[in-house]
Amino acid sequence: MMQERKQKGKILVFSSREICYLSSNFFANQIGAAFEKLGYEVTVCELSKEDDLDAKLARYIGQPYRLILDFNSLLPRMVLDDGTPYVDRLAGPFFDYILDHPLFHYQGLSSGVKNLHAIVLDEAQQKYVEKYYEKVASVHMLPLGATRAVYEGTKEPECRILFPGTYDRPDAVYQIVENAPEPLGSMMKDLIERRLADPTLPMEEAFSQHLKEEELELPAGQFALFMNSMYAVDAYVRDYFRKAALDALLAEKLPVTVFGEGWEKYSCGDGHSLRREPAVPFALSFERIAKAHVLLNVSPIFNRGMHDRVPAGMANHAVVLTDENPYLRRTFTGGKELLFYSLEKPDTLCEQAERALTDVRLREKIAASAYETFEREYTWKRRAEQILAFAEEVEA
């Protein structure tokens, strides 16, 4: 097997930064194991603040790799003593798997690194990077894979809706908007209004609409810089709709459990239907999801893509109740693999939640169909195969 791996080549996977709930380390090890199963010799390098980065990173320079992969990478920002970007000294295509909106990664994407390829979770975000970060060598759209719980156990006795995620009070986030200098503050308020009115409107399209109505034009670099400066818009929209979803469900006294950071900040009129559970490392979240009957997804930051909560629920036999967008509608069949609702119409959320909570046969049918789709399309092995195809494509 070792000889076969040497013939196939080497793959280097980084975890260059700690992402919420230690998810970067988890993703790096999951995809690394998948590459190994495909016969590649894999090195997973996890970086920390305590490391001697120069010494740790130098060992990989000049070694031939089939591909190099990182998640929300810090490496495109790193420069060697001679001024050469570190990534450009790596012998193999470097892929940065971006797990949120690329607007948050302005510094890395605009670094001018020649050997930088991006993978994003959303089709609109793919077009955004292609248009506004022209120096990025290639851009690919690929939702994350998912993992089955190691110890699935049995479903919890009470049928409840589980929402795993982070929360902050929308009014607290809005203070960033209020305190922003002009014209940034007015722009951000306008973008928020547009995105609340149309939750499937990508932020960059909202900004383009604003500029057109104001008869303003910005070169690509400045457009991307303004987007980065208006990060609070994305954060506000996310938390606004998370609060709205929970408010609607709890107003109907539907049982909801939340777990993750920040939920102590959430308050509602009727707390009897709400349970709060503490955050856990990402690797342990699948055990909790596997016990749930219904998994809620609220992700207005992916307007043409998919948050990893969706395949996580599919992999662990939880019925995924998700806000709809054009990509999800095209990729899945409502009532077969997922249940859809509209962020614009809270009553659709409550109606679908009621169906999921009360119809056992529907839950069994959807969970079984969704699991088949997961096995076919959303395993880490499948993701490894697709990333290898990207590497072949960029080197052709």
Roles of regions detected by a PLM:
Residues 1-7:
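Extreme N-terminal leader/targeting regions
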Residues 2, 12-16, 24-132, 147-151, ...:
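Extended catalytic core of nucleotide-activated donor transferases of GT-like folds
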Residues 7, 15-23, 27, 137-303, ...:
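Nucleotide-sugar donor-binding catalytic core of glycosyltransferases
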Residues 12-22, 26-38, 43-47, 111-112, ...:
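Catalytic binding pocket for nucleotide-activated donors in carbohydrate/polymer assembly enzymes
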Residues 109-113, 153-161, 353-357:
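Short, surface-exposed amphipathic charged segments that create phosphate/polyanion-binding patches used
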